[in-house]
Structures are given as C-alpha cells and as structure tokens.
Amino acid sequence: MSVLYGIAAATVTATASFLLTAVLAALLRAPALRLAVVDRRRRRPVPLLGGVAVVLVTAVVAWAGDRAGVVPLGPAAGRLLAAATVVGALGLAADVWRLRRRWLLAGTAVAAACVVPYGETGPVAGALAVGWVALVTGAFRGLDHADGVVGTVGVVTAFGVGACAAVELMDGPAVLLLVLAAALAGFLLHNWHPARIALGACGSLFTGFLLTGAAVLARTGYGPVGGAGVLCALTAVPVADAVLVLLSRRLAGRPLSRGGPDHLAHRLRRLGLTAQGVVVVLGGAALCAVVVGVLAHTGRVGGQAALWVAGGAAAGVLGLLRVRVYGPARLRRGAGVRAPVRRAGRGARAWAVVRRPRTAMRRARAGVSQAPRGATGAAGGASFRAAIFPVRQATSTENVQVGAPLRVRNG
C-alpha cells in the first residue's frame, strides 16, 4: 500500500504542477509585455516571465506537499529548493535590470556552496562541485536562446537525475525533480515554436541549479572520476553548447561576453533544420546522453560509457564549428578600412586604404600616372588627395559606399 500511495501522491503532485504552471505562464504574459520585460534578441519580442511561473509553482507545490506530509522533501532537498529559489530571484533581477554575468556567476556559486555536502565529498571535491554547479547552471541559461530548447532538455534531464536519486533512495530530491519536470512540461505549452513566453534568466538559472545540485547530491560518495563522467553525461547538451560558444568566439576573436547567433540551435537552423526539428534533435541528444548517465550510475554499463558521450559531444562541437555564423571575417588589425573612390576622368573605382598612408600614397601615384593625357594638374592633385582622404560628400545621385562596418563623415 505504501508504494501505491507514493505513486498516487507523486501523480497528483505532478498533475497539479503541470496545470498550475500552464495557467500561470499564460497569465504572466500580459504583465511582462506591459512592463517591457521581454527578450529583444529574437525576431520578435518575447516576454521573459515564464520562469517566474516555473519557480513559483515548483516551490509552492513542493513546499505544500512537504507541509502536508504527502511528499516529504527532507533537509537536503529543502536546502536545495531554497538555494534554487534564491538563484531564480537573482535571475529575475537580471531579466529586469540586466545584471552582469559575473554577478550571476558569483551569486550562483555562493548558493551552490550552501548546498554541497562537504562532510561526504571533502573540501577539494566540494570546491570542484561548487564550481561545476555554477558553470553548468550558466550553461543552462545559454540554452534559452531558441523556442522550446531549454524546456525540453530540462524535462529530459530532470527525469534522468530523478532516476539517479531514486536509485539512491533519496525520495526528497526525486519528488522535487518530478515536480520540476511537470512544471517545465506545462511551461512548454506556451514556449513551443512560435513561443509566446520564455523562461528568461529566472527560470533557466533555477532549472539548471536544481538539476545540477540534485545530481551532485545523488553522486555523493562515489569516486571522483566516475562521478565526473556521470555528471557530464547527464548535462551533455548544455555543456556542449557552452563549449561550442566559447570556442567559436575565441577563434573568431570576439569577446566571450558578447552575444551572437552562435549556439547549437542557431547552427542547426543554418544547416536547414526547422525550429521544431532543432528541439527534437537536441532533445534526442539529451535523452541519449542521460540514458547513458543513468546506466553508468546504476552500474549497468562501465564508466567508459561516459567517454563515448564525451566523444560524441566533441565530434558534434567540432562539426558545428565549421558552420559560419558571424558573417564575413573581420579585417585583421592594421589592415585598414578600404573605401571606393573615383579616379579623375574615369568611371572605374580605385581602392585606397585609410589607415595606411604609405599604401594610399603608392596607389594614389599609380592612379595619377594612369590619368589620361591632357588632364590638368589640378585634376591630378584632386585625384591624389581623394585617394588619401577617400570619404567625400555624396551628390544627390551618388551614395558613398564604405567597405567596412564603420561609416566616417568629413568633419
């Protein structure tokens, strides 16, 4: 009877979480638009308060179940839920006031330090766990760049980590992750393409922190090498997305904190996949990796199975790095800005380099020497000056075309 009672209680709790999140997310869309809490990086502004619905419903349903004695959480899951709620509040502040990433990372690390069980992991492994939780939580936030991606990956990962917790007889974290999975499923009703509302930093950080923190709790007591392999398998998709973004920006010479269309979903869309197809591919990849992680955690497969997941993720990252997402390559430092000018007496255009005066002088002399016979010295001098200072005032029928992103006006 106790088993049947537990199944019935979990089913009722998950159903309530699903329905409440679906209703609350729909209600929060209008206030988000009215307060201009929207994501403007997409083709159309998308409200960002969907994460508030996920955080509130998950916390309230789990707390109510614990208070009623239906699904007791226990002290470890209670601390995890409280810390995740604080991280979600920090993410909400980032959605409203655009906090810097360093503050989000620092706040997430402080919250993770309050959750990791140092008595069982030790100080060194505990510090590594804190760093891993903070970084992978930020990686989950990076998944919130396309419709349905972070919700789908979050649901799959929640079931996987919940299964690992259930194997360890950790009923509190298992029930908490079931409630989270149901809340994300209810949210996906509004986040499927075309999305009517998005998680934002609030929901994505809350989801990532809850999943990574529960995974650390479930793997406590195991060896560090095997534990790291299982943790990476459970979170393979967000980790691969973060590695892909960091590598591509580093190789392109872009600042790491500068956003761009360089995530997994963006590159898959450039390969021809639809928005729904991208969600299916990433969800399937997350499912395969999570299944391997759960089997490795239970001992059904050896620890080397995680290496296959890492190898597949590395191959995918290297393959997607070849997809161009930044457009034409930037001009190298010192190469100068080229601008087209007309030679005196001719219709052809000559290119002069603004930032390299010697090159401009040589090309200007060549242009003067090729001028037609009979041209006056004033015309030759005008061509010479125009090549050195190529930007000029456009007439009513001409437009100055500058071959660089920067436009310069004559003072």
From Swiss-Prot:
Disulfide bonds: none annotated. One of its GO terms (molecular function) is phosphotransferase activity, for other substituted phosphate groups. It holds the Pfam family Glycos_transf_4. GO terms for biological process: cell wall macromolecule biosynthetic process; cell wall organization; lipopolysaccharide biosynthetic process. Keywords: Cell membrane, Membrane, Transferase, Transmembrane, Transmembrane helix. It is found in: Cell membrane. It is a multi-pass membrane protein. GO terms for cellular component: plasma membrane. The chain crosses the membrane at residues 7-27, 45-65, 70-90, 120-140, 148-168, 169-189, 197-217, 227-247, 277-297, 301-321. Its EC number is 2.-.-.-. Belongs to the glycosyltransferase 4 family. This is Putative glycosyltransferase SCO3672. It comes from Streptomyces coelicolor (strain ATCC BAA-471 / A3(2) / M145).
